[in-house]
Regions:
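Short loop/turn motifs at secondary-structure junctions and domain boundaries
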Residues: 70-75, 163
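Conserved GNAT-fold acetyl-CoA-binding loop/helix
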Residues: 45-66
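Acyl-donor (CoA/ACP) binding surface of acyl/acetyltransferases
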Residues: 1-32, 36-46, 79-191
Length: 191
């Protein structure tokens, strides 16, 4: 059964080091989000589009929350912040985007975890929870994720969760100021 989740949707997953909670970004997360982004700017830079200090302003965050609300209410995307369940600490984000209905029934998935929380199973738990949500709640058939070939930690996450490599997309995304090839992975509802 396909449901239309609300902006208050919360997901949970288990990692080797406890559990994670995925919930939609909200205004109360702003200070924690800014601190996490600042703390991890250098760590995440090789894997993300360029961004500057304006990205971390209250105005920018408020605007982002407005866009998120529209995307969720339209069923186009479901952005989530990732929290460590043991202490409700914001540790990353996991976004379900580019939802296509009709004959495609698919979406794209992106995620990041702060360096201090990496390699502890939190990304794996988050991706697992997001896929379950895509297949069981949204009724999607396919979830796609694209990763740079040298992002071995992310590749390991995808493969462990059951994504299969499909090929390479040339100059797929402009990351860190440069067009980058990405390896495309996908997981199907029947996998």
């Amino acid at each position: 059964m396909v449901i239309k989740p609300s902006v208050n949707t919360t997901l949970s997953g288990l990692s080797a080091n406890g559990s994670v909670i995925l919930r939609h970004p909200r205004w109360a997360d702003f200070d924690y989000w800014v601190a996490l982004r600042k703390e991890n700017q250098t760590y995440l830079q090789p894997w993300e589009p360029e961004w500057n200090a304006k990205h971390l302003t209250r105005l920018s965050y408020r605007s982002r929350l407005g866009r998120f609300k529209k995307m969720v209410s339209g069923g186009d995307a479901y952005p989530f912040h990732i929290f460590r369940a043991s202490d409700d600490r914001l540790i990353g984000a996991c976004n379900i985007t580019h939802i296509e209905r009709g004959v495609a029934q698919s979406s794209k998935l992106g995620y990041w975890i702060g360096e201090h929380y990496a390699r502890q199973g939190f990304a794996r738990a988050s991706v697992t929870a997001a896929c379950k949500f895509c297949f069981e709640s949204l009724g999607l058939h396919r979830v796609e994720a694209a990763v740079q070939s040298d992002n071995l930690a992310s590749i390991k996450v995808l493969e462990h969760v059951g994504f299969q490599q499909e090929g390479t997309a040339r100059d797929y995304l402009k990351i860190n100021g440069k067009w980058q090839d990405h390896v495309v992975y996908a997981k199907l509802s029947g996998d």
